[in-house]
């Protein structure tokens, strides 16, 4: 049996954690995933981002929604300066902020279900200034900073969801279309029994060619991807007390 290959990166002990980074190293980073949600917003410079096989070219103000368990990596050329903010978010904390029909975790769910991960901060949206205000509160600290940061975080997530609901998405700039289609199919059928032969027949491709292209594009095998995704889904389902059948 092939060992699990995806790397779990980062950790989160707080309800949310914000980073403000700027560099031009262009370090190559393999596909990886987190057990928490993540938002990346590009503030300046040039950068690309890949999520579940889709590659995007980012412009300043664009933000990337990376839900828990989604494989992703930055795509940055050596010497290309880019400044960004990265927000780690605990899924349970985000769901607990739900009021009525306003669930702030909806944006991540929609991104994963529609396979649309990048959105543009335009049309009067204040996502970028809200990120900056939250960063300033965290940086300054002082009396009431934690409470103020919670309020600013909530406001930011409401605005992010408004942008997503408004459909201000950024189209993918690249990726192997066959592999992307396969990734999307796998994510929609994680609870179904799947075999390599059945997948190859569905996508009209030899199984050996399919497995080779999948590994070339993602760095991982179809089996390794499925196994890890199913384990992540099982943890999520068990954590929510569901009795959904898992394979």
Predicted regions and their residues:
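Short beta-strand/loop turn elements enriched in aromatics
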Residues: 7, 23-34
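Short, conserved beta-strand element in jelly-roll/cupin
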Residues: 32-49, 65
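Regular secondary-structure segments
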Residues: 43, 128-142, 183, 187-190, ...
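Structural motif
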Residues: 46-48, 55, 71, 93
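Short acidic-glycine-tyrosine-enriched beta hairpin
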Residues: 53-68
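Terminal helix-turn-helix DNA-binding modules in bacterial transcription factors
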Residues: 184, 188, 193-198, 205, ...
